[in-house]
Amino acid sequence: MPDGFSRTIETLAATTQNVCVNTENERSWLPNSGFQLRKAGVWFDAVRVDGAEGRRLADMMDSITAGDPGPIVTESNGARAVYFYLPAGSTAHRVWAPGVTRFNSGSGRVSYVPVPALSGETWPLFWYCPPVDSGRFVHPAILRNAAAALFGHPMSF
């Protein structure tokens, strides 16, 4: 009989459809070269998980979604953060596991997220999983549940 973690992964794998959002200007949120800061809540929200836990979560999302988790960026210096790009408006008003930092725009709040170009010199940021479609992002429920399973923090919906 599978353990609770395996059941969670199986349940999450059954709901891997990415969420579509504003596709008005195709990939205009992606810089042509280097990297730029983008205001969260306009094209996307983001969550960040630092260090080895972030990389484990990215690996988990890659596995759960059969290699199509949505856009994920890794940072190779400092806190070695991993950024998960989600549909705009999807991170606010939800409980996230400890260790997850949300980037969105709410009342009285402005957040900026680094976004690398798809090619060329983008150090210290690199695409773990580049965007494959302008309107596809990481699925919020799958990511929240995967983070909860990784950090051992039960979620209530």
Segments and roles (model prediction):
Residues 90-104:
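Histidine-dependent nucleotide/RNA phosphoesterase domain, centered on the 2H-phosphoesterase fold
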